[in-house]
Amino acid sequence: YGPGDNYHPENSHVIPGLLRRFHEAKIKNAPSVRVWGTGKPRREFLYVDDMASACIHVMNLNNKIYNKFTSLMCSHINVGSNFDITINELAKMIKSVVGFKGKIKFDKTKPDGNIRKLIDSKLINKLGWKPKVSLEDGLSRAYKDYIMNKL
């Protein structure tokens, strides 16, 4: 997620979709924002600049270091934040970032999806990379991008 994301109201991912939904509710002084599901599923998010820095880090690795931690058939590298959050916690964080004063209403008639999505990022961490952008900071940056470029 981050600058350049898809903020379409019907076919975006959860962060850009919620940023837009909370922003529009704030502008309209709506009493609430509807969020799909129960809010219980956990998701991991990675800011776009962190993904880019991970790619550059791996491309710049010395071959000896890379080969020490990988093998021919096991050379894939997961990149993640090593942190997951419930959709409920995410919605509250986005509500705060946007400055929406209304309520969050979970629509339990809509699907939750998988209960947890958190990847194993141990290898990239062993190779010396860790994300730098916190979720809250990334959400603030993404919201500023939305305001500046999507309205």
Residue map of PLM features:
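C-terminal substrate-binding subdomain of Rossmann-fold SDR/epimerase-dehydratase oxidoreductases
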Residues: 17-18, 24-151
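Flexible, glycine-rich beta-alpha linker
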Residues: 1-17, 41-42
